[in-house]
Design a protein with these regions (language model features):
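Structural preference for solvent-exposed beta-strand-turn elements
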Residues: 1-182
Length: 184
């Protein structure tokens, strides 16, 4: 794996994935982000085994593809320190991810990409298109009633149903009940 990417691209992608990087580190691999590189794109994936976020960024110069994992928090903190507009060179050297910029050379330990848990993608499932603002409104209008770290895990989430061109979201903490409906 050997490629170049701008600071802005990598920082944006890392920031998007940091929300699901495991903080308790029950498994060391969950503190890492998965790198997948092909001719024109970098896919970063992070998971906490409940949620998974993947981002796709455009790379500026491709030398070789590949897969690896690197510590998400350390990588994010490091990339934020680079100069605006910097082009960052990432490449694998054995079990290490080497990073070179105009300001210096850095080295991060990696874990094998084969150990990274990836959700199975369902083929041929039903899909629903919804705008970002509509989804945000749907969640906002019901999320206040969700349980927060309740021992009854089924109360800690949001129920979403799609029927007859309507999307309904429902949440409860056993004391409050919230329902929101959007026509699509």
């Amino acid at each position: 794996m050997d490629f170049y990417i701008t600071k802005e691209e990598i920082v944006s992608s890392l920031n998007a994935t940091l929300g699901v990087v495991e903080k308790r580190q029950t498994l060391p691999i969950l503190a890492n982000v998965l790198f997948e590189v092909d001719e024109s794109t970098l896919r970063l994936t992070a998971t906490d085994l409940e949620s998974e976020i993947s981002t796709i960024s455009t790379i500026s110069n491709f030398k070789s593809g590949g897969r690896t994992t690197a510590p998400a928090k350390k990588l994010s903190e490091l990339c934020r320190l680079f100069k605006e507009g910097d082009e960052i060179h990432f490449f694998l050297d054995g079990d290490n991810l080497k990073i070179e910029t105009s300001s210096g050379k850095y080295n991060l330990s990696t874990l094998p990409s084969e150990d990274f848990p990836v959700f199975e993608k369902e083929e041929g499932g039903n899909t629903v298109n919804i705008t970002g603002p509509n989804l945000k409104a749907l969640i906002y209008k019901t999320s206040f009633a969700m349980g927060n770290q309740d021992w009854r895990h089924y109360l800690n989430g949001l129920y979403i149903s799609v029927e007859d061109n309507n999307i309904t979201s429902v949440a409860t903490d056993a004391h409050r009940l919230a329902l929101s409906l959007i026509h699509i």
